[in-house]
């Protein structure tokens, strides 16, 4: 198994196991970025609707992989090499490392830009959403900026200056928030279709990377002015430096980007299987009858089948081939044949329905991804604190930190997952009034179960990496991602499941990853944490909390529901739903906090990982 040496840390009189210095700055910046992202995605979904949401996410998923690469392995590699050279007083080595890294990122970024801009239609086709092409093109320039940002952030972090990285990330997120939402809103008001509004929202991302890059360049030159004069050290050969960068970056990048890669594959697969089921198995139409008008699809299928040659099966493979031929003919400026016209019309209709369905699923994913924001501070702190304990040969201390990280994660993940499971539909009605809550609500409830697994998995990955086993999380994610793809390929195509089966892949994927991570930790980590005490109390408190939330919402909805003027069953208004949801969450939080304190589910060691943890421990009398 691949290992790296845990870096040593000087205590300097500071207490271990706390958020301090650079880790605290990075954690705070990451948390702010996640919060800004929440305030961005929720109104965006309501502005561009389900189809625009699908187009946005299909384009953004491609960018997310590149974003993960830029904020994971590459900056870490540059910062490590720069930090080592800087500690040795080798300023020429620092400059050579940065120059080579910047050159590498510019080359890769330019190649990615060319592919995304000129092959946007092909990439959108691979995602089974041709309307995502404008968004992919709008996002293409950001790839070049992302590469430059990676080099500059790594250089800054290598000098132990984390502030520029955090500030640039916040600038990027704020531009995305204000410019992206403004453009999307303006385009919708101008009568532009959802895919163009989605492209406008994505333009905010691109502008954000440009502004963040300008800030990082200014910070870089200001830092250079404060550096001492010339250095006489001889830098290493360029080839050796490049090999060092790749040696460090590749394992971390693969581990961090695996989730994004699986997401891209899975998004394409889910939409493709939805379209296939709609065409080949009309029995699945019953799943969506309440919010999808199938008359245009039925008409398009009938017209297309009449144009098929005798003996040709009416399958998705045949339709896709004919639609591709039609699009190629249009690109070449040639006239379409009648079968090509029929195939293109049917393919467009199928794609429109799948965009609506996937857009609702994406809105559920938006909420499902929010709990991971709270994991950022924990995952960032685990690696340096565990590594520092190991460098001091304090295995008992490292084990305590790992156990505390798992316990804090469980204390956060279990109630959030249970809350989403119990209140999935009401939360969708509150946050996304334009979405179909009868679709997105059950999807969110099912995804709530996966929330627990993914949060715990992220912290387990950090623990394994802190102990030096950087390749194990990659192997685990490959297995989990393969299971997710296999599951969704088969489940989504079932007429009785359809897109409602998509969350099953998340549950099985991250459930398997968590199980394997816990088994690996028990095998390769000395003094492994005891899992039953870590998970039992948070689970018990969360289960009782979930029952309380369910009861409060149910009682409130009965009291606040009223019959419509024309008669009929009682209906809960939007305001009434908001009151019930917020009331249920408030009661649930109070119940959970009381149970956590009563069960002694958190210890002083756990609180020591948090800012002001000592004061909180004294308040709870721990």
Protein language model regions, located:
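N-terminal membrane topogenesis motif
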Residues: 1-36, 92, 96, 233-252, ...
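Membrane-proximal transmembrane or re-entrant/amphipathic helices at the cytosolic face
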Residues: 2-5, 553-622
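Signature of the first transmembrane helix
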Residues: 2-4, 17-76, 106, 113, ...
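Short runs within selected transmembrane alpha-helices of multi-pass transporters and secretion channels
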Residues: 33, 41, 75-76, 138-158, ...
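Helix-loop junctions and terminal segments of transmembrane helices
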Residues: 72-87, 364, 375-392
């Amino acid at each position: 198994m691949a290992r790296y040496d845990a870096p040593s840390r000087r205590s300097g009189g500071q207490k271990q196991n706390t958020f301090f210095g650079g880790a605290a700055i990075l954690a705070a910046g990451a948390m702010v970025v996640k919060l800004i992202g929440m305030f961005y995605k929720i109104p965006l979904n309501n502005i561009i609707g389900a189809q625009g949401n699908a187009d946005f996410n299909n384009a953004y998923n491609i960018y997310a992989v590149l974003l993960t690469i830029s904020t994971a392995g590459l900056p870490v590699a540059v910062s490590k090499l720069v930090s080592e050279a800087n500690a040795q007083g080798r300023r020429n080595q620092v400059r050579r490392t940065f120059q080579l890294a910047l050159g590498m990122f510019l080359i890769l970024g330019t190649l990615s830009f060319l592919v995304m801009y000129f092959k946007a239609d092909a990439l959108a086709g691979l995602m089974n959403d041709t309307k995502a092409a404008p968004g992919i093109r709008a996002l293409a320039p950001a790839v070049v900026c992302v590469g430059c940002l990676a080099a500059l952030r790594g250089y800054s972090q290598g000098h132990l200056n984390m502030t520029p990285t955090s500030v640039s990330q916040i600038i990027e997120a704020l531009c995305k928030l204000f410019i992206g939402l403004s453009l999307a809103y303006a385009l919708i008001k101008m009568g532009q279709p959802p895919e163009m509004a989605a492209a406008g929202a994505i333009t905010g991302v691109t502008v954000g990377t440009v502004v963040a890059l300008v800030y990082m360049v200014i910070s870089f030159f200001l830092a250079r002015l404060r550096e001492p004069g010339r250095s006489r050290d001889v830098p290493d050969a360029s080839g050796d430096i490049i090999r060092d960068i790749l040696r460090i970056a590749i394992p971390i990048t693969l581990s961090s980007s695996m989730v994004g890669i699986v997401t891209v594959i899975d998004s394409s697969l889910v939409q493709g299987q939805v379209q296939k089921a709609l065409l080949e198995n009309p029995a699945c139409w019953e799943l969506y009858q309440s919010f999808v008008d199938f008359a245009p699809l039925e008409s398009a299928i009938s017209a297309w089948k009449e144009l098929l040659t005798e003996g040709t099966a009416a399958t998705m493979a045949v339709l896709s081939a004919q639609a591709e031929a039609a699009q190629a003919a249009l690109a070449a400026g040639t006239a379409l044949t009648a079968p090509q016209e029929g195939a293109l019309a049917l393919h467009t209709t199928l794609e429109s329905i799948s965009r609506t369905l996937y857009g609702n699923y994406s809105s559920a994913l938006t909420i499902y991804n929010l709990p991971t924001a709270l994991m950022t501070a924990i995952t960032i702190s685990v690696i340096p604190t565990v590594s520092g304990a190991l460098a001091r040969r304090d295995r008992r201390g490292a084990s305590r930190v790992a156990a505390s990280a798992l316990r804090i994660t469980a204390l956060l993940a279990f109630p959030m997952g249970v809350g989403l499971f119990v209140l999935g539909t009401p939360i969708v009605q509150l946050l996304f009034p334009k979405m179909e809550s009868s679709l997105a609500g059950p999807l969110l409830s099912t995804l709530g179960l996966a929330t627990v697994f993914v949060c715990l998995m992220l912290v387990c990955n950090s623990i394994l990496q802190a102990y030096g086993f950087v390749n194990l999380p990659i192997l685990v994610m490959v297995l989990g991602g393969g299971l997710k793809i296999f599951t969704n390929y088969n489940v989504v195509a079932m007429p009785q499941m359809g897109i409602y089966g998509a969350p099953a892949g998340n549950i099985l994927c991250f459930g398997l990853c968590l199980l394997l991570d816990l088994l690996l930790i028990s095998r390769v980590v000395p003094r492994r944490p005891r899992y039953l005490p870590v998970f039992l109390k948070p689970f018990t408190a969360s289960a009782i909390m979930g029952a309380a939330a369910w009861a409060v919402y149910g009682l409130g909805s009965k009291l606040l529901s009223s019959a419509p003027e024309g008669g009929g069953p009682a209906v809960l208004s939007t305001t009434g739903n908001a009151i019930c949801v917020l009331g249920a969450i408030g009661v649930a939080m109070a119940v959970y906090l009381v149970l956590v304190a009563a069960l002694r589910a958190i210890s002083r060691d756990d609180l020591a990982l948090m800012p002001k943890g000592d004061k909180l421990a004294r308040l709870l009398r721990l």
